[in-house]
Amino acid sequence: MANVRPSVVFKQQEVDHMADILKNSKSFIVFEYHGLTAANILALRNVLHSSNSKLFVLKNNITARAFEKAGVTGFEDRLTGPNAIAVAMDDEIAAIKAVNDVAKEFDFVKIKGAYLENKFADTHKIDQLAAIPGREGLYSMLLSCFTAPLRNVLYGLKAVAEQKGE
């Protein structure tokens, strides 16, 4: 190991680090970012950061080796060009939704695929997933379902009270 070049050791550490991140993530999405300005990428990073997601830009060789080490399949022939990986740590849909919104805003951003629940998802599946509201939106929908019957009962009681009061 003493004769190994420092750059090889560094690259192996990068592969190991990325493989650990991928194994511990809820989901991730791979996309080609060629054409995005630094301001666009910074805005995307901020959106991802607010949902406890991260954006990584690595060489395709390192990404492929990290995918192999993490047991990720489906991206073998898709890692060409300048790619970025948005990794979701908490909300499975947050990173996919953020990148899909950027891809709709800028035609030159190409989504290569996503990985969710240990399965590869193509662009059609990604569009379906991006249409699902985020965790907070789903919570608010659930809460409104619980409160709607109670609210209707209260409106009914108020109407009866107003009728008797007249």
Swiss-Prot record:
Q: Which residues form the signal peptide?
A: none
Q: Name one GO biological process term.
A: translation
Q: Which Pfam families match?
A: Ribosomal_L10
Alphabetized GO MF terms: large ribosomal subunit rRNA binding; structural constituent of ribosome
Key words of the record: Ribonucleoprotein, Ribosomal protein, RNA-binding, rRNA-binding
Source domain of life: Bacteria
- Cellular component terms, GO, for this chain's entry? large ribosomal subunit
**Family annotation (CDD domains):** Ribosomal_L10 (cd05797)
Regarding protein family, the annotation reads: Belongs to the universal ribosomal protein uL10 family.
* HAMAP family the UniProt entry points to: Ribosomal_uL10
Tell me how this protein assembles: Part of the ribosomal stalk of the 50S ribosomal subunit. The N-terminus interacts with L11 and the large rRNA to form the base of the stalk. The C-terminus forms an elongated spine to which L12 dimers bind in a sequential fashion forming a multimeric L10(L12)X complex.
Q: What's this protein's function?
A: Forms part of the ribosomal stalk, playing a central role in the interaction of the ribosome with GTP-bound translation factors.
Its recorded name reads: Large ribosomal subunit protein uL10
